[in-house]
């Protein structure tokens, strides 16, 4: 998992509330078990005008020239609602999204996202609306995020956010669940060696 310490990138506003996991990655693309390859299907029904993904919907912000190569999304409340599919953060990360800013997230999506290196940042609704409004007006679409300081820097404004210490450390060190387990491999092996074996 890629470390997240400081990131600066183009931010794209998605002015929708209650974006659910089926909108993020529709069910017909969930057959694969690898984390790679889902990015091209991200927001399929919003990004494309046809099922073959050959005609882009140019009214959708991610398809607009000024938001190409976006690595930050700014959206509205309850982002990631719906089913618990982990493919949703996989698709976002595979596309190149490093962080999402919103007033609130669905709990399961938030945990899945953080566990896959995708930073979820909760700001007050009026702060999010202000950022979205400024992104739409300004030529400079870049936002800087410091996980070390737990701050978002945009234009002349600074926004503070909270994140629990466990997920913050995992993101700073680039530790997913497997890497976190392997970090304690020596202790696990010592425990197994010293534990009694029981035969059934």
From Swiss-Prot:
GO terms for cellular component: 3-isopropylmalate dehydratase complex. The keyword Transferase does not apply. Pathway: Amino-acid biosynthesis; L-leucine biosynthesis; L-leucine from 3-methyl-2-oxobutanoate: step 2/4. Pfam families: Aconitase_C. The keyword Ubl conjugation does not apply. Disulfide bonds: none annotated. One of its GO terms (molecular function) is 3-isopropylmalate dehydratase activity. SUPFAM superfamilies: LeuD/IlvD-like. It is an enzyme of class 4 (lyase). It catalyses: (2R,3S)-3-isopropylmalate = (2S)-2-isopropylmalate. InterPro entries: 3-IsopropMal_deHydase_ssu, Aconitase/3IPM_dehydase_swvl, AconitaseA/IPMdHydase_ssu_swvl, IPMI_Swivel, LeuD. Its EC number is 4.2.1.33. Keywords: Amino-acid biosynthesis, Branched-chain amino acid biosynthesis, Leucine biosynthesis, Lyase. GO terms for biological process: L-leucine biosynthetic process. Heterodimer of LeuC and LeuD. Catalyzes the isomerization between 2-isopropylmalate and 3-isopropylmalate, via the formation of 2-isopropylmaleate. HAMAP family: LeuD_type1. Belongs to the LeuD family. LeuD type 1 subfamily. This is 3-isopropylmalate dehydratase small subunit. It comes from Campylobacter jejuni subsp. jejuni serotype O:23/36 (strain 81-176).
């Amino acid at each position: 998992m890629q470390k997240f310490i400081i990131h600066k990138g183009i931010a794209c506003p998605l002015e929708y509330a209650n974006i659910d996991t089926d909108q993020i990655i529709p069910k017909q693309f969930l057959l694969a078990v690898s984390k790679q390859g889902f990015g091209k299907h991200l927001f399929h029904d919003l990004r494309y005008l046809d099922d073959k993904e050959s005609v882009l919907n140019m009214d959708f912000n991610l398809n607009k020239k000024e938001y190409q190569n976006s690595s930050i999304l700014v959206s509205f409340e309850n982002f990631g609602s719906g089913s618990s599919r982990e493919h949703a953060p996989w698709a976002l990360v595979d596309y190149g999204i490093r962080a999402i800013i919103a007033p609130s997230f669905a709990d399961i999506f938030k945990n899945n996202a953080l566990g896959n290196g995708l930073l979820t940042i909760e700001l007050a609704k009026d702060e999010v609306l202000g950022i979205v409004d400024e992104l739409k007006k300004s030529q400079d679409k870049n936002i800087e995020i410091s996980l070390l300081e737990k701050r978002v820097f945009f234009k002349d404004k600074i926004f503070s956010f909270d994140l629990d210490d466990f997920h913050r450390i995992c993101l700073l060190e680039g530790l997913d669940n497997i890497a976190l387990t392997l970090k304690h491999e020596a202790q696990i092996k010592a425990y197994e060696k010293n534990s009694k074996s029981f035969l059934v």
